């Protein structure tokens, strides 16, 4: 479990983790990168993972993924890919390239922090300094200097959901009313997503609203609204912010 970057639970209670020991990039001429997508499972229900399965290996910087009935959507810059397990043995059999053209020259700003909305579409964050141009059946889609993508698998439609003065957005979450919130890792700030999502001409940034949650320290490495019975009643609906450098913990906001 080297250099984990994103995790997600499936509907069987198993924890999927993307690991990127090749970060920030592999050395030309050295061995090819072997980043992985792992499945951790508690088979005897003692609260500890006792089984590890390598769902996919020989990857390069899978810094974002999203589980879906048809497979696992995955970052493999410059591509958005789909890992498919044809025989349901918990090992990917195929990797399909769905979209091409996501910028690659700053690996920790590339499409990441995947999060699905209630409709089944999912969001991908992209940081500053990148200039992506992706060909789609609906025409080219572009994102410049930081933004949030939305991909709808049912329509095979990619769109720029938000483009504003972001540094490195790394966290998308939805509240009880399905409103979107966007967190910026570099600055540690948190923004209400809806006012930033209006369709604007390419290259025009949308001004931000006031911060949704107070900044304590940077950077933000994940956010979520509590809606699980694993947490007590008094925690339900609270906004959780994970910090990976400042105070090295998780803050709760009601």
Where do the language-model regions lie?
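Beta-propeller domains with acidic blade repeats across secreted/periplasmic ectodomains
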Residues: 1-254
């Amino acid at each position: 479990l080297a250099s984990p970057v994103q995790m997600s639970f499936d509907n069987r209670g198993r924890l999927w983790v993307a690991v990127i020991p090749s970060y920030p990039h592999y050395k030309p001429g050295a061995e090819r990168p072997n980043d992985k997508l792992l499945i951790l499972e508690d088979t005897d229900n003692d609260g500890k993972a006792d089984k590890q399965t390598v769902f996919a290996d020989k990857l390069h910087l899978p810094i974002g993924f999203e589980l879906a009935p048809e497979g696992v959507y995955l970052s493999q810059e410059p591509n958005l890919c789909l890992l498919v397990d044809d025989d349901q043995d918990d090992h990917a059999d195929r990797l399909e390239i769905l979209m091409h053209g996501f910028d690659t020259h700053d690996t920790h700003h590339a499409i990441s922090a995947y999060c699905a909305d209630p409709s089944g579409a999912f969001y991908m964050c992209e940081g500053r300094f990148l200039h992506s141009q992706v060909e789609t059946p609906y025409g080219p889609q572009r994102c410049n200097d930081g933004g949030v993508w939305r991909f709808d698998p049912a329509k095979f439609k990619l769109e720029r959901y938000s483009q504003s003065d972001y540094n490195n957005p790394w966290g998308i979450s939805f509240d009880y009313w399905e409103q979107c919130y966007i967190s910026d890792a570099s600055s540690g700030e948190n923004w209400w997503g809806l006012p930033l999502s209006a369709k604007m001409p390419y290259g025009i940034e949308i001004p931000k609203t006031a911060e949704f949650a107070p900044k304590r320290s940077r950077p933000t490495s994940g956010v979520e609204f509590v809606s699980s019975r694993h947490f007590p009643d008094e925690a339900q609906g609270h906004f959780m912010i994970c910090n990976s450098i400042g105070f090295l913990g998780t803050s709760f906001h009601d």
